[in-house]
């Protein structure tokens, strides 16, 4: 996950400041030297790092420690505030017009940045917000680009406008606008051609589309794993074509994350969304304050709550709560809970948003067997409806049949049954989900659906 190494190094820096009554200039300079190295190793732009550490130093030297905070926590607060400022201070929304007024988005980027997939992800996101998007296939050069967009569009339930790979992209874009107007579609997403590198032909084609179509916003899709190259690409597109903002992809990968900390400061353009996985649902709104919290190892509880709310069917949750009270929890419910967890990105995604877990994910991920969840699902699906509803009837003969059907050893079936019984006992003691909004605990906690 992005920023793991940076998070770990920053936490080590802050630990050294604990126990001091006042932050001396020497304390701050030593700490900031380590912070500077950590940021540079995370591939943050050098000029950005220099300005960042200068700003933190000016605010931290001689700073009285606030009540209830130790010096380490005080520095964390200052660093947090500066990180938020660095990434944009406030969340920037895509400039989508209200109601049925047509918005045209031109999506641009280099090959390998997952642009076409991201365009489909964005269309699904807009559809979930009540918009009627239209995907437009203007990449007529890359083999299978049109097919890829059509397949992803179908999965998202979004229409894809295509005129094949023999037409001029400008003509396709113009025809798509007329099609959208005729069919009451209010957001047009133009998937333009990517290139292996920035060239004049590519830029001219983008300029031609902008000149012939009333584009409301040009959105650059860029690969976060390319580090400083991502920032350079953003700057080049901004200078030559003009962009309104960025979507960073592959932020769930083994990336140092420097692009997220540099793009706004270098280009002046905001980050709209970040791609956090391969699924079409893995596109998250970019919140500078939440990203700063993740970087500092303080988690992102608000995003987790939103994921839970979006993934859990409230009627289903109420029904499960009733079952738990009656101790009527069965394998159907167990399977539902697993599917809900999967919708939220899996165990690793959930843990990464919890406070204190940021710098520990490398160790924890080695202990998590995501494939075990797939095997568990296979075992449950190999049961008959009667067996899922009445786990008590699972004798040795039935378990052997289930193991053969799932392609696993019977020991895995026995292990699952044992885990199920343990979970059933624990569930009785866990507060359930209430109707409407998610049930918030006394300390701002929340109730997960499993």
Segments predicted by a language model, with ranges:
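Residue-level signature of catalytic and energy-coupling elements of molecular machines
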Residues: 17, 43, 79, 110, ...
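Long amphipathic alpha-helical segments used for membrane anchoring, targeting, substrate engagement
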Residues: 3-20, 290-450
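Primarily NTPase-proximal linker/entry elements flanking Walker-type ATP/GTP-binding cores
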Residues: 6, 12-138, 145-165, 173-192
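Conserved phosphate-handling catalytic cores of large alpha/beta enzymes
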Residues: 173-177, 181, 185, 197, ...
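Short, surface-exposed connector motifs at secondary-structure boundaries
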Residues: 129-134, 156-160, 188, 213-218, ...
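Short, glycine/polar-rich helix-capping loops at beta-to-alpha or helix-loop-helix junctions
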Residues: 143-149, 230-233
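G-domain G4 guanine-recognition motif of GTPases
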Residues: 45, 111, 136-141, 163-165, ...
